[in-house]
Amino acid sequence: MQYTPFASDIELPFYTSLASLKINHDKLDDSARKLLGLYEIRSTDRPEASCRMQIHGTALTRDEVPFGYYRAEGMIKNVNTIEEYHNIDRNALLLQTGKMIWDAINDETIYSCPSLLVSFIVLSFADLKKYKFSYWFAFPAIHSAPSWTSVMDPKPLTGNESSTLVDAVQTWRYGVDARQHGFFLARKDWHVVNSPSDGTVLNKAHVDNQQSLSPIAKELGFSWKISSISDFETGFFHDALPEDCFVCFADPSNYPDAPGWMLRNLLVLVRQRWKLNEVYILRYRDVQSKRDQGRSVVLKLRSDTAHLDPNDSRLGSQMPMPKVTGWERNAAGKLTGRVTNLTEYMDPRRLADQSVDLNLKLMKWRISPNLNLENIKNTKCLLLGAGTLGSYVARNLLGWGVRKITFVDNGTVSFSNPVRQPLFGFNDCLGGGAKKALRAAAALEEIYPGVDASGYVLSVPMPGHPITDASKAELEFKELKKLVDEHDAIFVLLDTREARWLPTVMGKATGKIVMNAALGFDTYVVMRHGVENCSAPETELGCYFCNDVVAPADSIKDQTLDQQCTVTRPGIAAIASALLVELFVSVLQHPDGPAAPASIPKQESRTDHPLGIVPHQIRGFLSNFSNVIVSGKSYNCCSACSGNIMDAYKNHGWDFVRKAVNERNYVEELSGLKEVSLSLKKRVVIGTKFHRSSV
């Protein structure tokens, strides 16, 4: 006998499902998982394209069998390295799956799940960086020794025989589990008919009510009776002639003389369980829509073994398992696995989405399993400043998977910018220079199309810089306020101290996460601003201005060129930006979010938090390559976050901002800094007088 081996046929969505399962659930666990295989009878397929084992996109998660399909019981072992894929003991895998079939035959569990006769195993490795999937299917077939041979020419069913058989099989299937559908018993129950061999009249299972028979059944002279294979042992074929008893299987093979691969295991059941050395096999190849075509074929098979004694203990469960084969050959006919490169089929944007997330999700495999990546991904970030700090911060946010980034800047790209600001190039400087905010947003989308990036050309009102166009300034203030309200985190990355004042006020008033970075020549400060805590105001962390004794003012007036420009060591912006984003992500991972207390390094370990400590400020000194972690409380006379400033902003909005910008001492008087300054001066005067009187 020749048999048609299965050919694996994997739907593309399955690879995505496998990748998702590996990244998000299995991680380093390479235990074998259940896999639903499906095969079907397709009369229109060429013989060489038939007998396909289909793996649908939901094969890992669903257990239902679609109408018209037959079930196969599969397992997939997705290993962690390509070396393990190549070096694993494949023979042991095959034998393990074959033994499962052998044991099920011997202990009768095959009767509750005949689809085990169509078991398979898949060895795979998913290269999730390159989206290349290496895999190798094995369809275990237990050898029959000696082999079975055909002792008569294959006999196709007639159209009428096929039609009535299909109806009987369909009726039987409605009452049994899908695991039974692929294998069944069929028996001809004759009415009073003439035997086709000698013309004598035989009474076989006489049907009392001849009127209930269909016209085709009356013409044939018999009816089909269908039952599960377990009924062989309860006498389903009792008193029936051998030529009227058929062991049937759904055969997806379209070769006329080569039945499907599963027949090999079915014949092991016939010999090992039923002790038969001669059997009529029915290759069931008909479908409901074409049931009169008569494609099903009857085979008479015989094993050239000696008479099988049912009492021979060697034929029981103690009999050694026969040889097992079944590894699939590739398209070239070689005994080796296959490789699918999914990048050839995937939408480049979708591929980028999954690749961006890959490295982040790998962190959860071993290093930080409690990392909340969705929280990071869904945080909307507003970057005030699209220059050196803004460019580096944006790139680091992309690396962490942030999808919404908005720039605010009123500057243009100059020729000195591209070498220090990685979102810009030489062409952006031409024609007077592109607007930084707009070009930075466009550059992010060029880097990663999945990001939602936008830019706004706005000027931020600053104390010490009187307003010249009140209507324009008010519109820009309202636009900035709207952006602050729409975002979850504000990154203050502007050039001057006074430019940071209004964003600090807005962020504190709205309870947003405010992240701040500022640079010196070889120093930097990276910090998070505190948020309002009504229940424990004494625990509030300070903002960028909480250590000041004067309100911000025009810091570039009367300054020389080297004082007006941000003159820093070129690498310091990248260092500060990276620390700022890492601090931001640590804040998001803390249960208290922006209200997280300042960590004390010596008292906390990494195990207390998915990413380690959550400091308030990091002050860096590049001259000796050191960092100092600092914590500061909120100051009740702060020019940006004190109670008086918050109340004035919340109650008066633009009118407050306009006065703060235009009136020189307004902020100091409102916050209480003016009074503090006068008090200090009085103390100095008193101290001086006391010193002189003592002398």
Swiss-Prot record:
Pfam families from the UniProt entry: ATG7_N (PF16420), ThiF (PF00899)
Subcellular location(s) of the protein:
Cytoplasm; Preautophagosomal structure
Kindly state the positions of the motif GXGXXG motif in this protein.
385-390
Q: What is known of its domains?
A: The GxGxxG motif is important for the function, possibly through binding with ATP.
Could you name the Gene Ontology cellular component terms for this entry? phagophore assembly site
Cross-referenced Gene3D superfamilies: NAD(P)-binding Rossmann-like Domain (3.40.50.720), Ubiquitin-like modifier-activating enzyme ATG7 C-terminal domain (3.40.140.100), Ubiquitin-like modifier-activating enzyme ATG7 N-terminal domain (3.40.140.70)
What name is this protein filed under? Ubiquitin-like modifier-activating enzyme ATG7
Q: InterPro entries attached here? A: Atg7 (IPR006285), Atg7_N (IPR032197), Atg7_N_1 (IPR042522), Atg7_N_2 (IPR042523), ThiF/MoeB/HesA (IPR045886), ThiF_NAD_FAD-bd (IPR000594), Ubiquitin-activating_enz (IPR035985)
Q: Which UniProt keywords apply?
A: Autophagy, Cytoplasm, Protein transport, Transport, Ubl conjugation pathway
Indicate where this protein is primarily found: cytoplasm
The record's section on SUPFAM superfamilies has: Activating enzymes of the ubiquitin-like proteins
Name the active site residues: 565
Assembly and partners are described as: Homodimer.
Molecular function via GO: Atg12 activating enzyme activity; Atg8 activating enzyme activity
Give the family, as the similarity comment puts it.
Answer: Belongs to the ATG7 family.
Q: Does the keyword Cytoplasm apply?
A: yes
GO biological process per UniProt: autophagosome assembly; autophagy of mitochondrion; cellular response to nitrogen starvation; piecemeal microautophagy of the nucleus; protein modification by small protein conjugation; protein transport
Q: What does this protein do?
A: E1-like activating enzyme involved in the 2 ubiquitin-like systems required for cytoplasm to vacuole transport (Cvt) and autophagy. Activates ATG12 for its conjugation with ATG5 and ATG8 for its conjugation with phosphatidylethanolamine. Both systems are needed for the ATG8 association to Cvt vesicles and autophagosomes membranes. Autophagy is essential for maintenance of amino acid levels and protein synthesis under nitrogen starvation.
